[in-house]
Amino acid sequence: MASSAGHNPGLCDWVMSKTRVAQFKLGQVVRHRRFAFRGVIFDIDPEFNNTEEWYQSIPAEVRPRKDQPFYHLFAENAETEYIAYVSEQNLLLDTSGEPVRHPQVAEVFERDAAGGYRPRVSLLH
C-alpha cells in the first residue's frame, strides 16, 4: 500500500482553488457585458495587476473581484479606439465576426482565414 506521508489534501485543495485558467485567449475578440465596447485580447494577467488608484476609481457597486484573470484589450467603441483593462467577469465572446479597427491590432496580430486573430510570428521570437 502506498504511503500518503507528506500529502496535505487541504493544502492541495487550497492551491487548486487559487489556480485560475483564463477563459479567453490571446487574439480572441471579446465585448464588455455592461458597456458598449469590444476588443482583441493582447495580454492576460492571471489576477488583478494594475494600480490601487485605478481599482478604486471603479464605482464600488460594479468593482470586479481582484482574484480573477484581467485582460488587456485593443478596444474600440462607436467613437474611438483605446487600450482597456477588463476583468474576466465583465467579458463575453464577441461573435459578430467584424474586424476590430484599433490601429495597433495590425502591428501585433494577423487575421486568419476564419477571421480570427493570431500573433504575428515575428513577435514570438
Role assignments for model-derived ranges:
Residues 2-29, 34-38, 45-48, 120-125:
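Mixed-charge, Lys/Arg-rich low-complexity intrinsically disordered regions
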Residues 17, 52, 61-63, 95:
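Charge-rich, low-complexity amphipathic helices
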Residues 28, 57-62:
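Intrinsically disordered, low-complexity boundary segments flanking structured domains
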Residues 38-40, 72:
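Generic detector of isolated residues embedded in canonical secondary-structure elements
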Residues 42-43, 52:
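Short, glycine/acidic-enriched capping/hinge loops at junctions between secondary-structure elements
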Residues 43-45, 75:
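Residue-level signal for short segments within beta-strands and strand-turn junctions
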Residues 48-57:
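Short, solvent-exposed secondary-structure boundary/capping segments
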Residues 63-125:
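Intrinsically disordered, low-complexity, charged/polar segments
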